[in-house]
Amino acid sequence: MPLFYETEVRSRLLLGTARYPSPAVLAEAVRRSGTDIVTVSLRRETAGGRQGGAFFELIRELGVRVLPNTAGCHSVSEAVLTARMAREVFGTDWIKLEVIGHQDTLQPDVFGLVEGARILTGEGFQVFPYTTDDLVVAERLLEAGCQVLMPWCAPIGSAMGPQNVQGLRAMRAEFPDVPLIVDAGIGRPSHATTVMELGYDAVLLNTAVAGAADPAAMAEAFTKAIDAGHAAHGAGMLEPRDMAVPSTPVIGKAVFS
């Protein structure tokens, strides 16, 4: 089972809670997915209001662990402030740290990310950093105190699937003992299977489920795909070959001359 900051979870799917058609649809998707962890974006305008209160009550009723995030933050100071507020609201040291560096692609500001991680780990936070597949940045995040890495496979919400499989493979090889969660860009269950076959520990999804015609059914499909990819990696898959290899034995085969 995956282990994140000494916390063991059963499911390898982390599910976002934004953009669902209704709270009821969200609740059913969470249940069908079997997830242990949901991500929540803290907003000042709803945290203390009636809408925010009802949403947080729904999350509590689902009995899942909350991973607050700093989505939408474009500076270190904004991300750190949001993280501190989230700790007060949710009573957890977990934080998914996002520092956005580019408005159109929502690419992480990796320099701000490392700085923010250093500040927050110094304050006792357990940081889940949304990052790229750059190995140097990953090393800096680990040096800053992170014990989990969350590389993207494509821009947030793009549904493009893994754009740099070799980069993701290299990260897994470079950090074999670090929990790795693919975050952002997954669009189909087959995408999730692909990254799990590389040996990743988990996948974080939101748009691919929330935007589906049937979010609850899609959540269940992703769970099955993730489990299949994980099982395939553990079973030991064949490596691609350049040439054909006969799969049918030739012993006892008739020879015509």
From Swiss-Prot:
Q: Which GO terms describe its biological process?
A: thiamine diphosphate biosynthetic process
Which top class of enzyme applies to this chain? transferase
Checking SUPFAM superfamilies in the record gives: ThiG-like
Check the record and name the InterPro entries matching this protein. Answer: Aldolase_TIM (IPR013785), Thiazole_synthase_ThiG (IPR033983), ThiG (IPR008867)
Question: Where is it mainly found?
Answer: cytoplasm
Top-level taxon of origin = Bacteria
Q: Which family does it belong to?
A: Belongs to the ThiG family.
Assembly with partners or alone: Homotetramer. Forms heterodimers with either ThiH or ThiS.
Q: What does this protein do?
A: Catalyzes the rearrangement of 1-deoxy-D-xylulose 5-phosphate (DXP) to produce the thiazole phosphate moiety of thiamine. Sulfur is provided by the thiocarboxylate moiety of the carrier protein ThiS. In vitro, sulfur can be provided by H(2)S.
Name of this protein: Thiazole synthase
What is the scientific name of the source organism?
Answer: Rhizobium meliloti (strain 1021)
